[in-house]
Amino acid sequence: MKFTKAEARKRRHFRVRQKVVGTAERPRLNVFKSNTNFYAQIIDDTKGVTLVSASTLKMDLKSKSNTLAAQKVAEEIAKKALAANITQVVFDRNGYLYHGKIKAFAETARENGLKF
């Protein structure tokens, strides 16, 4: 049985989520990309609460999902996380390959003060 790209991503995401858990001390930084937008949120899995979120929906980059938009979202989420006293996170790439937009997001978040 041949898998589509979406099915393969879902299987990778399921495998990764079994291992990656966000705690209060080190919450999970989750990313999601659609065809039109890029989203990121920092989640405390023990409480099941989103602590900080950012996306291209709330920025001047509405309906952009390129590497520039991913970098802007990374800057925004890093700024919000540092304001909320969050410096260390666990990166959950949501089954996406560490390439392109995801890589640009991760590197920019690291440059802006998040540690993972």
Curated annotation (Swiss-Prot):
Assembly description:
Part of the 50S ribosomal subunit; part of the 5S rRNA/L5/L18/L25 subcomplex. Contacts the 5S and 23S rRNAs.
Q: What keywords is this UniProt entry annotated with?
A: Ribonucleoprotein, Ribosomal protein, RNA-binding, rRNA-binding
Query: CDD domains, from UniProt?
Result: Ribosomal_L18_L5e (cd00432)
Instruction: List, alphabetically, the NCBIfam families matched.
Output: L18_bact
Q: Which gene encodes it?
A: rplR
Matches recorded under InterPro entries: Ribosomal_uL18_bac-type (IPR004389), Ribosomal_uL18_bac/euk (IPR005484)
Any idea what this protein is called? Large ribosomal subunit protein uL18
| Source organism (scientific name) | Mycoplasma mycoides subsp. mycoides SC (strain CCUG 32753 / NCTC 10114 / PG1)
Task: State the function annotated in the UniProt record.
Answer: This is one of the proteins that bind and probably mediate the attachment of the 5S RNA into the large ribosomal subunit, where it forms part of the central protuberance.
In the record, the note on similarity to other proteins reads:
Belongs to the universal ribosomal protein uL18 family.
Its lineage reads: Bacteria, Bacillati, Mycoplasmatota, Mollicutes, Mycoplasmataceae
- Name any one GO molecular function: structural constituent of ribosome
Q: Which SUPFAM superfamilies match?
A: Translational machinery components (SSF53137)
GO CC terms in record: cytosolic large ribosomal subunit
| Disulfide-linked positions | none
Q: Which GO terms describe its biological process?
A: translation
